Amino acid sequence: MQRFIIAICVVLLVINCSPKKEIKKVRIGMCSDVHLPTMHDAEYRISSFIDSMKIAKPDFIVELGDFGIPDERYAPYFEIWNSFPGPKYHIIGNHEMDGGTSLEEAIAYRKMMNSYYSFSRNGFLFIVLDGNDKEYPDQKGYRSYIGAEQISWLKEELKKASEPIILFSHQGIGSDPGNPGERYSIKNADKVRALFEIHNQSKPESRIIASFNGHTHHDFAENINGIWYITINSMAYKWLGEEYEYLRYNEGVDKDFKWIKYTAPYKEPLFTVVEISTEGYITMSGKYSSYVGPTPWELGYPEHLKKFVKPQITKRFMEF
């Protein structure tokens, strides 16, 4: 009996002395689709985000694209962004190349080494993708594709990864139902997601947890085969289009900012703080606003888009 008790004590001692798996957490200040050239109150919006982040003190901040073009008119707003004292990251959106701006100019202005890159923080690997590749060599106009060269780079990043992975891109990589206006994922999203899923099966210790994007000015999250695909709403507005023209502010604003009348602006800027933990959860702080002027639905905007189009970033708790 005495030997049995001793054996039990030894087992318990071994269990208690076994190294506990370290819990890793990271907090991210996140915004998307600021669209500096579109909004007359862009300074207020970007300042609100940075001021809030100086108080929240996340591990880093990131904007998910469509921030603005390299132009002296917008230089003060880039300075506000750069006033955040911690690490900060840009993602290249499709509107970064407006006004004849080249990809190289957009990258250089932000002091980025490349439009796709990776970095580590708090035991997580963050991979930034560029959805603006050409689908074919002579493609003109709008792009939404991840090309072969970038795919090869991504495969190498996944191959050498040893930490849990979070993805950032401007255009989404989630599902695309095909209903008008619902989703605008990259054209080869299915292929890229398949690559993610193969990686998660072969290297669960460095699994891809989530992919964050902007672009659609939607508020949406979905889980596809164990990976969260999360669309962060625009800081500023929902684009409606010329058929929904409405004078949102006044004639003076409309004269100097001609695109606002085709949008449904949010009264208050939208942004969020995301926390990710290896305990198996993602949290997002919520931020709720309202429209300046009539809602999209009062102007006849398609009803089937209500589940995406909201003047808010929804508070979320997502498990993985």
Predicted segments with their positions:
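A short C-terminal boundary segment appended to hydrolase-like catalytic domains
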Residues: K255-F320
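Active-site-proximal beta-strand elements of phosphoester/diester hydrolases
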Residues: K25-T38, G123-D133, I166-F168, I227-N233, ...
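Short acidic, glycine-rich surface-loop motifs adjacent to enzyme active sites
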Residues: K159-G178
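Short, well-ordered beta-to-alpha junction loops that form the rim of enzyme active sites
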Residues: G131, F168-I173, G214-T216, K287-S289
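Extended active-site neighborhood of metal-dependent phosphoesterases/phosphodiesterases
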Residues: E72-K160, K191-I208, H218, E222-N233, ...
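Sec-dependent N-terminal signal peptides
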Residues: F4-L13
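Active-site glycine-centered loops adjacent to acidic/histidine catalytic or metal-binding residues
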Residues: D33, G65-D66, G93-N94, H170, ...
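N-terminal active-site segment of His-dependent metallophosphoesterases
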Residues: C17-P76
